[in-house]
Amino acid sequence: MSKVKIFWQETCPNCPQAKELGKKLAASGVAVEYHNIRDSAGLTEAVMHGVMTTPSVVIVADDDSEKAVWRGSTPKFDEVKATLASAPA
């Protein structure tokens, strides 16, 4: 099953919107991970996905391959749900 990874940092003015999207997705049953790029684990994960800016939202399959990416922006809830529905697990 696909999951959503949200990359954020404290100084990012648009990251609260991305984190709110994550809360809505989680409430609808989507697996969501949050990665603060200012800590070592979050930075490592960001490097693996080529994240250079925040917020970034990445949909990944079980094997961690990317299915969709929004870098430097927060997609709409419906857009993410539609992408998840059409993305193979």
Describe the residue ranges of each PLM region.
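Local sequence-structure signature of Cys/Sec-based thiol-disulfide redox active-site neighborhoods
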Residues: M1-S28
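Short alpha-helical
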Residues: P13, A41, P75
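A generic local structural motif
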Residues: K19-E20, G42-E45
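Non-catalytic interaction surface on structured domains
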Residues: G22, G29-V32, P75-D78
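Thiol-based oxidoreductase modules, predominantly thioredoxin-like and allied folds used
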Residues: V30-L43
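Short amphipathic alpha-helix with an adjacent loop that forms part of the alpha/beta core around
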Residues: T44-H49, V80-L84
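Structural micro-motif
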Residues: H49-I59
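Non-catalytic, surface beta->alpha helical segment in thiol-disulfide oxidoreductase systems
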Residues: I59-A89
